[in-house]
Amino acid sequence: MAHTFKEAARFRDLLWFLITLGIYQSGVSTVVVLAAIYAQEVIGFDTQSLIILIMVVNVTAAVGAFVCGHLQDRMGSVPTLAITLVIWIIAVLAALFATMSLDMWIAGNMIGLAMGASQAVGRALVSKFSPSERAGEFLGLWGLVNRLSAILGPLSYGLINYLSNGNHRTSLLSTLAFFIVGLLLLSKVNESRGKAAAISSGALMDDAG
């Protein structure tokens, strides 16, 4: 795995995107793990309402993934992901200031749209930035970053929740920060340059062969 990281470091935009992915995906993982608890303990959702919300969010996630595909074709993956992260930020802000069930329904469906889109576009970008002969290796890094984020995000939320005496709204600020920082880091990723580097490396490998 260390060798794979060393190889990935040769591709500036791939490495920068993996760092970006690790940050914003920490926010995504936190929402996936703790959204239900937030809805119940902060907004007062009962079990039945929560189940219905989760079912609807799954539908909006599918819609988000579908729309994401069309946006990537028209705009590119990086602009599409930027839009997705803005939606995440707005959704988390909506949840942060939610005071009634309707607020959480709005936030939840925005989360669904963003979740479906961000999962799809993240993998697509790693594929674009990976030389064909190393695609499997670098997609393995993508998976590793996702797994690490699944630990970092909820852990940060839990730590702040503990330090704030169980204040979920304060804890949610860490989740919001992940998306804001992720969006800022994404501005350093150049999709055209990253694709060109992957293609160029592949051509060099072919010539060497």
Show where each model-derived region lies.
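Juxtamembrane intracellular "pre-TM" segments in multi-pass secondary transporters
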Residues: 1-19, 204-209
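Structural signature of the two symmetry-related core transmembrane helices
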Residues: 79-94
